[in-house]
Protein backbone atom coordinates (compact mmCIF):
# COMPACT_ATOMS: atom_id res chain seq x y z
CA UNK A 1 0.00 0.00 0.00
CA UNK A 2 1.44 3.39 -0.96
CA UNK A 3 1.60 6.35 1.39
CA UNK A 4 -1.10 8.07 -0.68
CA UNK A 5 -3.66 5.31 -0.31
CA UNK A 6 -6.11 5.77 2.52
CA UNK A 7 -6.89 2.96 4.89
CA UNK A 8 -10.54 1.96 5.10
CA UNK A 9 -12.52 3.50 7.91
CA UNK A 10 -15.52 1.99 9.60
CA UNK A 11 -17.82 3.05 12.40
CA UNK A 12 -17.72 0.61 15.27
CA UNK A 13 -20.45 0.55 17.87
CA UNK A 14 -19.53 1.23 21.48
CA UNK A 15 -18.56 -1.97 23.25
CA UNK A 16 -21.28 -3.58 25.31
CA UNK A 17 -20.73 -5.80 28.35
CA UNK A 18 -19.99 -8.86 26.21
CA UNK A 19 -17.83 -7.09 23.64
CA UNK A 20 -14.11 -6.43 23.60
CA UNK A 21 -13.12 -2.77 24.10
CA UNK A 22 -12.31 -1.18 20.77
CA UNK A 23 -9.12 0.73 20.06
CA UNK A 24 -10.89 3.21 17.83
CA UNK A 25 -14.38 4.57 17.18
CA UNK A 26 -14.66 5.96 13.66
CA UNK A 27 -11.16 5.47 12.25
CA UNK A 28 -8.73 2.61 11.91
CA UNK A 29 -5.66 2.98 14.10
CA UNK A 30 -2.38 1.85 12.55
CA UNK A 31 -0.06 -0.20 14.73
CA UNK A 32 3.55 -1.33 14.42
CA UNK A 33 4.51 -4.19 16.74
CA UNK A 34 8.17 -5.19 16.71
CA UNK A 35 9.19 -8.78 17.31
CA UNK A 36 5.66 -9.91 16.51
CA UNK A 37 6.19 -13.13 14.55
CA UNK A 38 5.79 -15.28 17.68
CA UNK A 39 5.24 -15.26 21.43
CA UNK A 40 4.15 -12.10 23.20
CA UNK A 41 4.52 -9.96 20.08
CA UNK A 42 2.23 -12.19 18.06
CA UNK A 43 -0.36 -12.22 20.83
CA UNK A 44 -0.28 -8.42 20.93
CA UNK A 45 -0.67 -8.15 17.16
CA UNK A 46 -3.62 -10.54 17.17
CA UNK A 47 -5.26 -8.74 20.10
CA UNK A 48 -4.98 -5.32 18.48
CA UNK A 49 -6.20 -6.61 15.13
CA UNK A 50 -9.18 -8.23 16.84
CA UNK A 51 -10.03 -4.83 18.29
CA UNK A 52 -9.95 -3.14 14.89
CA UNK A 53 -6.37 -1.95 14.35
CA UNK A 54 -4.45 -2.36 11.09
CA UNK A 55 -1.29 -4.07 12.33
CA UNK A 56 2.18 -4.25 10.83
CA UNK A 57 4.03 -7.40 11.86
CA UNK A 58 7.79 -6.85 12.11
CA UNK A 59 10.44 -9.51 12.65
CA UNK A 60 13.32 -11.46 11.15
CA UNK A 61 11.48 -14.67 10.23
CA UNK A 62 9.48 -14.13 7.04
CA UNK A 63 7.72 -17.50 7.18
CA UNK A 64 6.46 -16.96 10.70
CA UNK A 65 5.53 -13.37 9.88
CA UNK A 66 3.40 -14.41 6.93
CA UNK A 67 1.73 -17.04 9.11
CA UNK A 68 0.72 -14.37 11.60
CA UNK A 69 -0.62 -12.18 8.80
CA UNK A 70 -2.62 -15.11 7.39
CA UNK A 71 -4.09 -15.91 10.81
CA UNK A 72 -5.16 -12.30 11.36
CA UNK A 73 -6.66 -11.98 7.90
CA UNK A 74 -8.53 -15.26 8.31
CA UNK A 75 -10.18 -13.66 11.33
CA UNK A 76 -11.10 -10.66 9.11
CA UNK A 77 -8.38 -8.45 10.52
CA UNK A 78 -5.98 -6.17 8.66
CA UNK A 79 -2.29 -7.09 8.73
CA UNK A 80 0.93 -6.82 6.76
CA UNK A 81 4.46 -8.11 7.35
CA UNK A 82 7.80 -6.36 7.05
CA UNK A 83 11.18 -8.00 7.60
CA UNK A 84 13.37 -6.21 10.13
CA UNK A 85 16.55 -7.02 12.05
CA UNK A 86 16.64 -4.58 14.93
CA UNK A 87 20.24 -5.34 15.81
CA UNK A 88 21.14 -3.08 12.88
CA UNK A 89 20.80 0.69 13.23
CA UNK A 90 20.22 0.95 9.48
CA UNK A 91 17.43 -1.62 9.63
CA UNK A 92 15.75 0.31 12.44
CA UNK A 93 15.72 3.47 10.33
CA UNK A 94 14.40 1.52 7.34
CA UNK A 95 11.64 -0.03 9.45
CA UNK A 96 10.43 3.40 10.55
CA UNK A 97 10.36 4.61 6.94
CA UNK A 98 8.65 1.46 5.65
CA UNK A 99 6.05 1.58 8.40
CA UNK A 100 5.06 5.12 7.51
CA UNK A 101 4.80 4.19 3.83
CA UNK A 102 2.91 0.92 4.30
CA UNK A 103 0.45 2.23 6.87
CA UNK A 104 0.30 5.87 5.84
CA UNK A 105 1.42 6.80 9.35
CA UNK A 106 1.83 4.99 12.67
CA UNK A 107 -0.60 5.70 15.50
CA UNK A 108 0.48 2.88 17.83
CA UNK A 109 4.03 1.68 18.42
CA UNK A 110 4.68 -1.38 20.55
CA UNK A 111 8.38 -1.80 21.25
CA UNK A 112 8.23 -5.51 21.98
CA UNK A 113 11.33 -6.96 20.28
CA UNK A 114 14.05 -7.91 22.69
CA UNK A 115 16.78 -10.42 23.35
CA UNK A 116 17.86 -11.90 26.65
CA UNK A 117 20.62 -13.94 28.20
CA UNK A 118 21.61 -14.61 31.78
CA UNK A 119 24.97 -15.08 33.41
CA UNK A 120 27.52 -13.67 35.85
CA UNK A 121 28.60 -10.09 35.26
CA UNK A 122 32.26 -11.11 35.23
CA UNK A 123 31.60 -13.45 32.31
CA UNK A 124 29.83 -10.88 30.12
CA UNK A 125 31.85 -9.88 27.07
CA UNK A 126 31.59 -6.61 25.19
CA UNK A 127 29.92 -8.17 22.14
CA UNK A 128 27.09 -9.55 24.29
CA UNK A 129 26.70 -6.16 25.95
CA UNK A 130 26.55 -4.29 22.65
CA UNK A 131 24.09 -6.78 21.13
CA UNK A 132 21.74 -6.61 24.10
CA UNK A 133 21.66 -2.82 24.20
CA UNK A 134 21.35 -2.53 20.41
CA UNK A 135 18.07 -4.44 20.33
CA UNK A 136 16.65 -3.64 23.76
CA UNK A 137 17.52 0.06 23.98
CA UNK A 138 18.83 1.55 20.74
CA UNK A 139 16.09 0.10 18.52
CA UNK A 140 13.11 1.34 20.56
CA UNK A 141 14.85 4.67 21.15
CA UNK A 142 15.27 5.47 17.48
CA UNK A 143 11.95 3.98 16.38
CA UNK A 144 10.29 6.28 18.88
CA UNK A 145 12.46 9.18 17.72
CA UNK A 146 11.28 8.62 14.14
CA UNK A 147 7.60 7.86 14.76
CA UNK A 148 6.53 9.82 17.85
CA UNK A 149 6.78 13.26 16.17
CA UNK A 150 4.17 12.17 13.61
CA UNK A 151 1.86 11.06 16.41
CA UNK A 152 2.40 14.39 18.15
CA UNK A 153 1.58 16.29 14.97
CA UNK A 154 -1.69 14.36 14.70
CA UNK A 155 -2.36 14.93 18.42
CA UNK A 156 -2.94 11.22 19.05
CA UNK A 157 -0.58 8.35 19.68
CA UNK A 158 0.14 5.36 21.85
CA UNK A 159 3.56 3.91 22.61
CA UNK A 160 3.95 0.80 24.76
CA UNK A 161 7.34 -0.55 25.77
CA UNK A 162 7.62 -4.18 26.82
CA UNK A 163 10.05 -4.44 29.71
CA UNK A 164 10.37 -7.16 32.38
CA UNK A 165 9.99 -7.75 36.09
CA UNK A 166 13.78 -7.98 36.42
CA UNK A 167 13.97 -4.32 35.39
CA UNK A 168 12.94 -3.47 38.96
CA UNK A 169 13.89 -6.64 40.86
CA UNK A 170 17.49 -7.58 41.60
CA UNK A 171 18.18 -11.08 40.30
CA UNK A 172 21.54 -12.87 40.13
CA UNK A 173 22.67 -13.30 36.55
CA UNK A 174 20.23 -10.73 35.19
CA UNK A 175 22.40 -7.61 35.39
CA UNK A 176 22.82 -7.18 31.63
CA UNK A 177 19.26 -8.01 30.58
CA UNK A 178 17.65 -6.26 33.55
CA UNK A 179 19.66 -3.08 33.07
CA UNK A 180 18.73 -2.87 29.39
CA UNK A 181 15.05 -3.14 30.23
CA UNK A 182 15.40 -0.74 33.15
CA UNK A 183 16.73 1.78 30.64
CA UNK A 184 13.60 1.25 28.55
CA UNK A 185 11.45 1.72 31.64
CA UNK A 186 13.13 5.07 32.32
CA UNK A 187 12.66 6.06 28.69
CA UNK A 188 8.96 5.32 29.13
CA UNK A 189 8.74 7.99 31.82
CA UNK A 190 10.89 10.50 29.95
CA UNK A 191 8.88 10.09 26.75
CA UNK A 192 5.60 10.36 28.65
CA UNK A 193 6.73 13.79 29.83
CA UNK A 194 8.07 14.76 26.40
CA UNK A 195 5.20 13.67 24.18
CA UNK A 196 2.27 13.73 26.61
CA UNK A 197 1.39 17.40 25.98
CA UNK A 198 0.70 16.48 22.34
CA UNK A 199 -1.77 13.67 22.90
CA UNK A 200 0.76 10.81 22.91
CA UNK A 201 0.78 8.42 25.86
CA UNK A 202 3.82 6.29 26.62
CA UNK A 203 3.52 3.35 29.00
CA UNK A 204 5.29 0.11 29.77
CA UNK A 205 4.17 -3.45 30.39
CA UNK A 206 6.48 -5.55 32.55
CA UNK A 207 5.86 -9.28 32.13
CA UNK A 208 6.90 -11.88 34.66
CA UNK A 209 7.60 -15.50 33.72
CA UNK A 210 5.68 -16.09 30.47
CA UNK A 211 5.58 -19.27 28.42
CA UNK A 212 6.70 -18.45 24.86
CA UNK A 213 8.85 -20.11 22.18
CA UNK A 214 11.68 -17.92 23.45
CA UNK A 215 11.46 -19.24 27.02
CA UNK A 216 11.08 -22.90 26.09
CA UNK A 217 14.81 -23.38 26.57
CA UNK A 218 14.46 -22.54 30.26
CA UNK A 219 12.69 -25.84 30.82
CA UNK A 220 11.87 -26.61 34.44
CA UNK A 221 13.49 -23.36 35.57
CA UNK A 222 10.57 -21.44 34.07
CA UNK A 223 8.07 -23.52 36.03
CA UNK A 224 10.02 -22.97 39.22
CA UNK A 225 10.09 -19.24 38.56
CA UNK A 226 6.33 -19.30 38.09
CA UNK A 227 5.92 -20.87 41.52
CA UNK A 228 7.69 -17.92 43.15
CA UNK A 229 4.99 -15.41 42.19
CA UNK A 230 1.76 -15.04 44.19
CA UNK A 231 -0.29 -16.42 41.29
CA UNK A 232 1.75 -19.60 41.58
CA UNK A 233 2.05 -20.18 37.86
CA UNK A 234 3.61 -19.10 34.58
CA UNK A 235 1.71 -16.50 32.57
CA UNK A 236 0.55 -16.53 28.95
CA UNK A 237 1.24 -14.17 26.04
CA UNK A 238 -2.49 -13.41 25.84
CA UNK A 239 -2.43 -12.02 29.38
CA UNK A 240 0.34 -9.61 28.43
CA UNK A 241 -1.49 -8.67 25.22
CA UNK A 242 -4.64 -7.79 27.17
CA UNK A 243 -2.72 -5.17 29.15
CA UNK A 244 -1.26 -3.69 25.98
CA UNK A 245 -4.69 -3.60 24.33
CA UNK A 246 -6.02 -1.50 27.19
CA UNK A 247 -3.09 0.91 27.16
CA UNK A 248 -3.51 1.69 23.45
CA UNK A 249 -7.28 2.12 23.71
CA UNK A 250 -9.26 5.34 23.82
CA UNK A 251 -10.21 4.52 27.40
CA UNK A 252 -6.57 4.76 28.51
CA UNK A 253 -6.08 8.36 27.37
CA UNK A 254 -5.28 9.50 30.93
CA UNK A 255 -2.80 6.68 31.63
CA UNK A 256 0.67 8.00 30.85
CA UNK A 257 4.14 7.13 32.12
CA UNK A 258 2.89 4.04 33.94
CA UNK A 259 4.34 0.55 34.15
CA UNK A 260 1.75 -2.23 34.27
CA UNK A 261 3.14 -5.37 35.86
CA UNK A 262 1.82 -8.60 34.34
CA UNK A 263 3.80 -10.85 36.63
CA UNK A 264 1.30 -12.72 38.76
CA UNK A 265 1.89 -10.32 41.65
CA UNK A 266 5.67 -10.63 41.86
CA UNK A 267 6.15 -6.84 41.93
CA UNK A 268 4.07 -6.69 45.10
CA UNK A 269 6.26 -9.05 47.09
Q: PLM features: residue spans?
A:
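C-terminal substrate-recognition "lid" of short-chain dehydrogenase/reductases
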Residues: 103, 141, 156, 233-262, ...
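Short, small/polar-rich loop/turn modules that mediate ligand/substrate recognition or access, typified
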Residues: 196, 201, 255-257
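Alpha-helical segment proximal to the catalytic Tyr-Lys
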Residues: 149, 192-194, 253
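Residue(s) in the substrate-gating loop at a strand-loop-helix junction
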Residues: 164
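Active-site helix of classical SDR
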Residues: 144, 180, 188
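Substrate-binding pocket helix/loop in short-chain dehydrogenase/reductase
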Residues: 120-121, 128-133, 159, 225
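Conserved glycine-rich cofactor-binding loop
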Residues: 37-38, 61
Amino acid sequence: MSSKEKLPSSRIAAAGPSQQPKIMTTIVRRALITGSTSGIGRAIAEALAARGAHVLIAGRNTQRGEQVVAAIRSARGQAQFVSADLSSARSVAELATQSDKLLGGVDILVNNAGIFSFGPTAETNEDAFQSMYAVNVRAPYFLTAKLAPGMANRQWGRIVNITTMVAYLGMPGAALYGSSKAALQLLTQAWAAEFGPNGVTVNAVAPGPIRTPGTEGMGEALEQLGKTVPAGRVGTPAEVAAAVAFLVSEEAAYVNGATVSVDGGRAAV
